[in-house]
Amino acid sequence: MSESSITIRQASPGDAERWRELFTAYGVFYETDFDGAVLDGVWTWILDPEHPVTAFVAEADGTVVGFAHVRMQPDTFLAGPGWFLDDLFADPAHRGSGVGTALLEAVADHASANGGGTLRWITAADNERAQRVYDRLATRTTWVTYERETSG
């Protein structure tokens, strides 16, 4: 399958079941078991035009085979828009076919059409396959990511 046979579009209500399957598989890949509340909550965000998360899906032969979730966030270094790609996943059966590249290009086009700015994302240090794609499409930074859980 070539990249030209992949269609990228914004997620729609009819994608719910397949998105849930793929998002669950994404969680397994990162050793996370998403419960129903998380799946329902994220899907609600995706369908809410007022929520900052925008979801794109990749279709091949009429089947959703990947997704990307992106959100605008203020960039204090530029006093303008910035973008964060929260999630990107391709069905393992379709990896290497251009799904990830097509999704990233669609996300970048979306950011450009909505004010531009820097698009950032993270990946696991051992996700070398994804890093090979990302190294072709973006600049690897020297930033180190930290996390701290807060109550609320």
Label each region the model flagged.
Residues G80-P92:
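Conserved acetyl-CoA binding element of GNAT-fold acetyltransferases
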Residues G62, G98, N127:
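Conserved G/P- and acidic residue-centered "switch" motifs that form tight phosphate/ATP-binding loops
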Residues S112-T123:
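Conserved GNAT acetyl-CoA-binding A-motif
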Residues M1-T7, S151-G152:
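Short, low-complexity, intrinsically disordered N-terminal peptides in bacterial proteins
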Residues A90, G96-D109:
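Conserved acetyl-CoA-binding loop-helix of GNAT-fold acetyltransferases
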Residues Q10-A16, E21-G80, H110, T141, ...:
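Acetyl-CoA-dependent GNAT
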Residues T101, E105, A125-V144:
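Conserved active-site alpha-helix within GNAT-family acetyltransferase domains
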